[in-house]
Design a protein with these regions (language model features):
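Active-site core segments that coordinate phosphate-bearing ligands/cofactors
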Residues: 1-18, 24, 29-40, 44-47, ...
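Short beta-strand to alpha-helix junction loop
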Residues: 32-34, 59-63
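A conserved helix-loop-beta module that forms one wall/lid of the active-site cleft
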Residues: 46-61
């Protein structure tokens, strides 16, 4: 058995290979940023065997190849390399070209998210924000994504429309 995030599971179903990334491990709180390794202290505290952690691959690197079963079911070419995976907010920041300290991605959908990149290992001691290894984080170059999530942003837009803009009146 291995601990897998959704992207790890999808890649495993495509390739048959089980692996993960530092970014993925950090989203699962399994990464020790100060020592640049799996958070053994957390694994030990909860009694998790370290063998549950999958092999770690770079975020941008070959992480497997599409196998015959997946290729046949999905109409993909067998052997196509799987070369990237990350969580939703790191992916959003990537799509908006947010890579460097001080750069911010902000989106509003079901939730409202502000995601900024930091170049230092630090954290919020009150846990008001989440910190992940950003897609371009390496041991040599710290790039941490700091995420503030405001749940209910999308439903707020609906509430405003129903309660402030009567039927027949557009936002324009």
């Amino acid at each position: 058995y291995k601990i897998m995030l959704p992207g790890d599971y999808i890649a495993m179903k495509l390739s048959g290979d089980i692996c993960t990334t530092v970014s993925g491990l950090s989203e699962g709180m399994f990464w020790d940023f100060k020592n640049n390794r799996v958070a053994d202290f957390l694994m030990d505290y909860y009694g998790f065997d370290s063998s549950l952690i999958a092999d770690i691959k770079p975020t941008f690197a070959e992480q497997g190849r599409v196998n015959a079963v997946a290729a046949n079911e999905l109409g993909l070419k067998e052997g196509t390399p799987i070369t990237y995976r990350a969580g939703d907010q790191p992916n959003n920041a990537l799509s908006l070209n947010v890579f460097n300290p001080g750069e911010i991605a902000s989106t509003a959908g079901t939730s409202g998210v502000v995601y900024g990149v930091n170049g230092e290992v630090n954290y919020d001691p009150q846990s008001r924000v989440n910190t992940f290894a950003h897609v371009n984080h390496t041991m040599e170059q710290t790039r941490l994504g700091v995420l503030l999530c405001i749940n209910g942003t999308g439903i707020l837009n609906s509430w405003v429309k129903r309660n402030i803009a009567p039927e027949g009146i557009s936002y324009n």
